[in-house]
Amino acid sequence: FPKGAKTIYFSAPDKSGSWSIYSTTKLNESLWSAPQLLNESITSMGNDIFPYLSADGKSLYFSSNGHFGMGGYDLYVSRWSDEIGDWDTPQNLGFPFSSPADDFLYYDTPDGKYTIFASNRSTGRDSVNVYAIEYENLALKKTISQEEAANIALLNLPDNNQYDDGVEESDKADNS
């Protein structure tokens, strides 16, 4: 439990027997609020399990077999929206995090160097492998203008037409 955290997220079976994600908030040294089911965009008809809150408290990762996905349990993220004061619609993390098998237990290391998760994609359903994805901090070699970036996003097709794949700006130092 993170030091100073006031809200925790956990999975528990609901009245139908499906697992859903709940939150509870610390009211004082020994009292917690009644558990609250998360909003309907996160709560699915299937099982929503293994919630993990990012260190900055703005991203909630979890595994679900009830949202549209690649098959089995997939990994999802929902971002906190200050605008609506709630979690937004979950997004499937896609490959390499999600697969047609069961993928769960998402975790980012505190130093941001690794993402760790478990999956049975290359094992039987009764065992899992733990995967660690390492991120390298690559130095930014050059910044380019929006005009230069727009030209990079153009793809020349065999019929001499161009396909514009689009450009997104980033104001972050890591270009994410």
Can you say where each PLM-predicted feature lies in the sequence?
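Short, conserved micro-motifs composed of acidic
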Residues: F1-S176
